[in-house]
């Protein structure tokens, strides 16, 4: 974790941009692909770093900030369901101090001094879902999706044992929300079946549950041992209860499965006692839990507290610490990524941690190996927090033998044997051989065909590797001539191992379908280092059309100062991204490839869809005591209308809203000639804007 106090504004801006892209990628892998790329603890560290940066530099908060998003964008695999009320995530807490801060925030917001009852319940590690009933009949089930739009999994939910299709004495309209999960022993049995049928094993129970419920073939879902718990109500025609405790009792009476392990805490001590109880006994439970959820028990108080961008103020998740294990390090392999970055991966003597067999772990970077003095044949400590690839946290020196081998940091690329470049004090090592490096070329093609890029279904990593190995493709362009090439081959693709007439016919259809693509997705598909989906959208918005984009990039490759300045001035494109864009287009082969792709693709112009108002992007500051609403509520309203709220007045401030006793901020705003309005003017102003929105 970086020291926020020592970071400059320029560095903060770069870091926020990098975090937005990285967290978006991790969200997509976790929520959509059901395939986490990093540990829960590593993700939480990145997310918390993003929050701290935003709190320190509120005027730098990005429009695509992870703190404003829930889950990830949904795919086109299922029909879409718009949630009548957003399905929000919970903020995370990692120690008792975080929980004390949470309880203090409740008191301050509600302006109360006494402890108000908190409902405590286990945090199930599964897939969140919503179920809607009309006149007692189950009509719609949906995943969380991005929090606003989910995937329609109605038929799949109906296969879950004991899930009620019809309920008696229900209100005319009822929504319930819960978690779909697979018990630990069922998970072990399922993986044995997968192995016996020569199918891929699931990494953990959460992945198994998510992958099972999101099956297009409902017959597969029906065979899976899925279970569920309901933990809250969503939108309903009439109030079922006035507290969380009453609600769960009512839902149980309506025949829903609710978790019986819960506690209504009347003190801070009772909260922490319940947490310790569950932390100690979690391994005795038949299902995975990764923490405890605390909620204000009183619904009226919940409604008063409301929400921030992605989570409720009245609830929080107290996460458990990571599970620790120990095993032998057998070897270290080096992987080469799409952008040429090398990543060391530990190959381990398989070890079961928390019900999951672990055989690989991340070593983060080469400097980390040296710092921890990790050697081949060492016994290493592992940390796992519900993740696919755990982390190596240290070495058991007491078990070190004389035959351990120090790892030599590579000098040449393991894929193409070209000399490597060391970046950032040896933390990052890159191969600069680009498309001439087989590993980079493979990863680049995989990225090009991925769902958020060209979205060519039927071309997964395995299929891409096969086509490259058979010399049927060598770059992204070859994909669009594959059908023609196949027709002239002596042995056709449909007659090769792993393929058939139907899969090949579907592939041709999917390739043809992919040839119509938006400019922002095309730019993202190119795989430019540090240019994720949001930054690709920024570039598309700036250049609008493919023809203009490639013309401007060609000028950039010839050191055109106007194009350089245009990119340099583009809000959201940091210095590091600018260098990466320049490096990418300096390579003539890249421009040639893009031009050839442009000739075979129908690349649509960028179209702006976001609604804006006069406050969008403006920086506001509040000062003094507000009489009508609390400062927190005022900030929330401003942010909903697109403004950014800062804690101090600067030359970047657009508007100061003054309550009682404005103080030094008012004085400074007058000195800087910043527009100033009082609370009444502000309330009248936002009332007009909210009507427009």
UniProtKB/Swiss-Prot annotation:
<feature type="binding site">
    <location>
        <position position="416"/>
    </location>
    <ligand>
        <name>Zn(2+)</name>
    </ligand>
</feature>
<keyword id="KW-0520">NAD</keyword>
<keyword id="KW-0227">DNA damage</keyword>
<dbReference type="InterPro" id="IPR012340">
    <property type="entry name" value="NA-bd_OB-fold"/>
</dbReference>
<dbReference type="GO" id="GO:0006281">
    <property type="term" value="P:DNA repair"/>
</dbReference>
<protein>
    <recommendedName>
        <fullName>DNA ligase</fullName>
        <ecNumber>6.5.1.2</ecNumber>
    </recommendedName>
</protein>
<dbReference type="Pfam" id="PF03119">
    <property type="entry name" value="DNA_ligase_ZBD"/>
</dbReference>
<dbReference type="GO" id="GO:0046872">
    <property type="term" value="F:metal ion binding"/>
</dbReference>
<feature type="binding site">
    <location>
        <position position="319"/>
    </location>
    <ligand>
        <name>NAD(+)</name>
    </ligand>
</feature>
<dbReference type="InterPro" id="IPR001357">
    <property type="entry name" value="BRCT_dom"/>
</dbReference>
<dbReference type="GO" id="GO:0003911">
    <property type="term" value="F:DNA ligase (NAD+) activity"/>
</dbReference>
<dbReference type="Pfam" id="PF03120">
    <property type="entry name" value="DNA_ligase_OB"/>
</dbReference>
<feature type="binding site">
    <location>
        <position position="144"/>
    </location>
    <ligand>
        <name>NAD(+)</name>
    </ligand>
</feature>
<dbReference type="InterPro" id="IPR001679">
    <property type="entry name" value="DNA_ligase"/>
</dbReference>
<dbReference type="InterPro" id="IPR018239">
    <property type="entry name" value="DNA_ligase_AS"/>
</dbReference>
<dbReference type="InterPro" id="IPR036420">
    <property type="entry name" value="BRCT_dom_sf"/>
</dbReference>
<feature type="binding site">
    <location>
        <position position="295"/>
    </location>
    <ligand>
        <name>NAD(+)</name>
    </ligand>
</feature>
<feature type="binding site">
    <location>
        <position position="179"/>
    </location>
    <ligand>
        <name>NAD(+)</name>
    </ligand>
</feature>
<dbReference type="GO" id="GO:0005829">
    <property type="term" value="C:cytosol"/>
</dbReference>
<feature type="binding site">
    <location>
        <position position="437"/>
    </location>
    <ligand>
        <name>Zn(2+)</name>
    </ligand>
</feature>
<dbReference type="Pfam" id="PF01653">
    <property type="entry name" value="DNA_ligase_aden"/>
</dbReference>
<keyword id="KW-0234">DNA repair</keyword>
<dbReference type="InterPro" id="IPR013839">
    <property type="entry name" value="DNAligase_adenylation"/>
</dbReference>
<dbReference type="InterPro" id="IPR010994">
    <property type="entry name" value="RuvA_2-like"/>
</dbReference>
<dbReference type="Pfam" id="PF12826">
    <property type="entry name" value="HHH_2"/>
</dbReference>
<dbReference type="GO" id="GO:0006260">
    <property type="term" value="P:DNA replication"/>
</dbReference>
<dbReference type="InterPro" id="IPR013840">
    <property type="entry name" value="DNAligase_N"/>
</dbReference>
<keyword id="KW-0464">Manganese</keyword>
<feature type="binding site">
    <location>
        <position position="413"/>
    </location>
    <ligand>
        <name>Zn(2+)</name>
    </ligand>
</feature>
<feature type="binding site">
    <location>
        <begin position="89"/>
        <end position="90"/>
    </location>
    <ligand>
        <name>NAD(+)</name>
    </ligand>
</feature>
<keyword id="KW-0235">DNA replication</keyword>
<dbReference type="InterPro" id="IPR004149">
    <property type="entry name" value="Znf_DNAligase_C4"/>
</dbReference>
<feature type="binding site">
    <location>
        <position position="121"/>
    </location>
    <ligand>
        <name>NAD(+)</name>
    </ligand>
</feature>
<comment type="similarity">
    <text>Belongs to the NAD-dependent DNA ligase family. LigA subfamily.</text>
</comment>
<keyword id="KW-0862">Zinc</keyword>
<keyword id="KW-0460">Magnesium</keyword>
<dbReference type="InterPro" id="IPR004150">
    <property type="entry name" value="NAD_DNA_ligase_OB"/>
</dbReference>
<feature type="domain" description="BRCT">
    <location>
        <begin position="610"/>
        <end position="693"/>
    </location>
</feature>
<feature type="binding site">
    <location>
        <begin position="40"/>
        <end position="44"/>
    </location>
    <ligand>
        <name>NAD(+)</name>
    </ligand>
</feature>
<dbReference type="InterPro" id="IPR041663">
    <property type="entry name" value="DisA/LigA_HHH"/>
</dbReference>
<keyword id="KW-0436">Ligase</keyword>
<feature type="binding site">
    <location>
        <position position="431"/>
    </location>
    <ligand>
        <name>Zn(2+)</name>
    </ligand>
</feature>
